[in-house]
């Protein structure tokens, strides 16, 4: 019998004995190994018996022998692949735990060599990276040799794949696994330029990760495979899962904290001025703000270093605070927020002073004197407060409706300060522009929302309108991308669309473009549903006197709901018509619109209504044929009834449709026909019976039915 035949016989005999007498089987194999020490099959059979019996120590020793003596055998690499696969995942499977134990019994040098060899056997970039990560984590000394090359290979793979987003498997492994090993290794000595490159890559990943759009089902979905890696392309379309990674491997905990910690490490390595380890983003901004004061006095080298430090820190603070602000005012943009539970908020001009007016000399004694003297004027609800003073502007917000109002406005303020700092010097602005270009921030809808609100806050309304146009374009693109998204309901999409339209109306008003403002707000009103009558009552009851009147350049942050937006639209329309109604030129149509709109939030507009009555008395007549369609306020009805009397001045009122034609054909001594007078009395009686109607429904109908005439009434 040949030597090969002898070996096969001995192995076969040992296999037959394993079930009945494993010790006899081992004896046969020990004998065989002594006779044929270079035969692979004999030694592999010995290892297989120990592995199948899950005897960790002996299996480890035998694996060591066959790895050293037969490194090129394919079956050896299949075994090593199974072991490294067990090492790469957190499976609690019994066999996987055994394989990990076998690996742990190997000498460190052999472990290192085995992992390096296993890496060479990998042709998939992800698997190769994961294998090298095992090596780097177990043998930190290898980071110096392999860390940067691994990081660069991941970034190169990302570039070659031409992926749409930084939130991909290659960047995630680089930022969350490889980069911390590189930065925290004291033996590494990287150029400052490379440190900044890596910091910016990490920042882009973390920012894009936290600002991801909602997933299709709002839950983490993905492969249930044991391994941490999938082949790229799997799971595509599952937005919560990073393409190429399992669901568990896709999760990044506390991304903002991780980024802040990384900033501290990079700052220390770059020898930043005043770097003591960042405890918060606000503290980070404070340090670079102090540094900016010395920027002009620095030499060329110092200027360059300071510039890079300031831009990097301010950029991160800007996006951190802008994200938290936008996540409060439009949470449905991001994962982890349900658009069904919280809608958007919108930053608008504060119109609480729309009812204010200068005192005028009264020539008419009013029937309802109590309207002028018996009630104290009110401005806004007592649950509101002011924060964020800057450039002479205030932002008013209801604390009862936005529980985290102080934090939200503080984030808005800090983000604005960061933006201003980044644009305080041409060099800073140029470096920041490079980062924005590389990150394609012009495509970030959430950041455009912040920029728009900031521009509105700055009072640059023409620029704000351009920004709103860009925002609408991005919103349309996002809606098209999410047309299969079950969470993106028509209601939510409509509210977000209203947000932009209402801000456009507010900006046009601030620019004095009242007709354009009216067009936009009427567009928004068409999609709103007025609240029930109870809302009107409770709103009135909650209003209490305020000691001082706010200035006209304040802003108000309000929820983008019918309950809040319809009142704003009515106030804005009133503001648009108010100046036209009370000019020296007679404009009964504008004055009539004002009277209709003054019914809302009554009696806030009492003084303005009384001024309108004074003007009517001075004119001696008033024509508004929509009066009985939309005026249901009892105080107003009594005042107009009084105007017809001798005591009220016998004012000629043309409030019925076609009343003017009747008067021309049937004039009597007092300038009014008896038939018209009777019609007026009956109409007034019918109107009194309507005083209990839902006022918001009446005013909403006014906006819808009279849309064309309202727009045409403005220049």
UniProtKB/Swiss-Prot annotation:
It is found in: Nucleus. Residues 220-241 are annotated as: Disordered. Keywords: Nucleus. It comes from Danio rerio. This is Integrator complex subunit 10. Component of the integrator complex, a multiprotein complex that terminates RNA polymerase II (Pol II) transcription in the promoter-proximal region of genes. One of its GO terms (biological process) is RNA polymerase II transcription initiation surveillance. Belongs to the Integrator subunit 10 family. The gene is ints10. The keyword Nucleus applies. PANTHER family: INTEGRATOR COMPLEX SUBUNIT 10. The keyword Metal-binding does not apply. One of its GO terms (cellular component) is integrator complex.
């Amino acid at each position: 019998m040949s030597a090969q035949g002898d070996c096969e016989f001995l192995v076969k005999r040992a296999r037959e004995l394993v079930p009945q007498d494993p010790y006899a089987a081992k004896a046969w194999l020990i004998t065989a190994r002594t006779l044929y020490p270079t035969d692979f099959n004999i030694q592999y059979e010995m290892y297989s018996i120990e592995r199948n019996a899950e005897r960790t120590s002996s299996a480890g020793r035998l694996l060591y022998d066959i790895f050293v003596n037969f490194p090129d055998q394919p079956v050896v690499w299949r075994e090593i692949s199974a072991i490294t696969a067990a090492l790469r995942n957190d499976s609690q499977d019994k066999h996987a735990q055994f394989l990990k134990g076998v690996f742990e019994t190997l000498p460190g040098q052999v472990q290192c060599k085995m992992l390096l060899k296993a890496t060479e056997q990998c042709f998939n970039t992800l698997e190769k990276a994961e294998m090298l990560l095992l090596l780097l984590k177990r043998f930190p000394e290898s980071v110096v040799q392999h860390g940067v090359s691994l990081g660069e290979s991941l970034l190169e793979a990302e570039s070659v794949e031409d992926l749409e987003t930084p939130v991909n498997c290659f960047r995630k492994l680089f930022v969350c696994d490889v980069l911390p090993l590189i930065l925290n290794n004291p033996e590494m000595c990287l150029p400052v330029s490379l440190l900044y490159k890596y910091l910016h890559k990490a920042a882009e990943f973390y920012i894009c990760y936290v600002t991801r759009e909602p997933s299709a089902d709002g839950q983490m979905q993905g492969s249930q495979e044991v391994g941490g890696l999938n082949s790229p392309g799997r799971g595509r379309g599952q937005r919560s899962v990073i393409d190429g990674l399992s669901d568990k491997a896709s999760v990044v905990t506390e991304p903002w904290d991780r980024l802040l910690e990384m900033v501290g490490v990079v700052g220390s390595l770059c020898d930043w001025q005043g770097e003591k380890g960042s405890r918060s983003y606000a503290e980070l901004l404070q340090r670079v703000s102090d540094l900016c004061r010395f920027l002009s006095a620095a030499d060329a080298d110092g200027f360059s270093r300071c510039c890079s430090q300031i831009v990097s820190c301010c950029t991160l603070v800007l996006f951190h605070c802008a994200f938290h602000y936008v996540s409060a005012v439009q949470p449905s943009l991001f994962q982890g927020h349900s658009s069904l539970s919280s809608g958007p908020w919108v930053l608008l001009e504060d119109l609480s002073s729309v009812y204010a007016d200068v005192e005028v000399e009264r020539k008419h004694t009013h029937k309802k004197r109590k309207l002028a003297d018996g009630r104290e004027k009110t401005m806004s609800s007592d649950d509101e407060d002011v924060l964020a003073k800057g450039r002479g502007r205030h932002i008013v917000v209801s604390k009862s409706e936005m529980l985290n109002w102080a934090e939200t406005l503080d984030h808005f303020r800090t983000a604005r300060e960061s933006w201003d700092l980044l644009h305080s010097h041409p060099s800073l602005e140029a470096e920041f522009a490079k980062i924005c270009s590389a990150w394609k921030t012009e495509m970030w809808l959430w950041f455009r929302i912040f920029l728009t609100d900031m521009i509105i806050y700055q009072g640059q309304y023409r620029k704000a309108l351009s920004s709103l146009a860009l925002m609408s374009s991005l919103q349309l693109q996002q809606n098209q991308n999410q047309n299969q998204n079950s969470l993106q309901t028509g209601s939510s999409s409509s509210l977000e669309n209203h947000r932009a339209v209402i801000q456009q109306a507010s900006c046009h008003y601030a620019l004095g473009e009242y007709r354009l403002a009216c067009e936009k707000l009427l567009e928004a009103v068409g999609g709103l549903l007025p609240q029930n009558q109870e809302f009107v009552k409770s709103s009135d009851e909650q209003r209490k006197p305020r000691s001082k009147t706010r200035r006209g350049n304040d802003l108000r942050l309000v929820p983008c709901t019918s309950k809040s937006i319809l009142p704003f639209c009515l106030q804005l329309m009133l503001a648009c018509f108010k100046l036209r109604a009370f000019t020296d030129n007679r404009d009964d149509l504008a004055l009539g619109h004002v009277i209709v709109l003054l019914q809302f939030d009554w009696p806030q507009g009492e003084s303005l209504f009384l001024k309108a009555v004074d003007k009517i008395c001075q004119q001696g007549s008033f024509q508004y044929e929509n009066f009985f369609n939309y005026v249901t306020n009892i105080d107003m009805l009594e005042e107009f009834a009084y105007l017809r009397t001798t005591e009220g001045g016998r004012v000629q009122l043309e409030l019925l449709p076609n009343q003017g034609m009747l008067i021309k054909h049937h004039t009597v001594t007092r300038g009014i026909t008896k038939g018209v007078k009777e019609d007026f009395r009956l109409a007034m009686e019918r109107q009194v019976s309507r005083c209990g109607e839902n006022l918001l429904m009446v005013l909403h109908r006014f906006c819808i039915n009279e849309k064309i005439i309202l727009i045409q009434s403005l220049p």
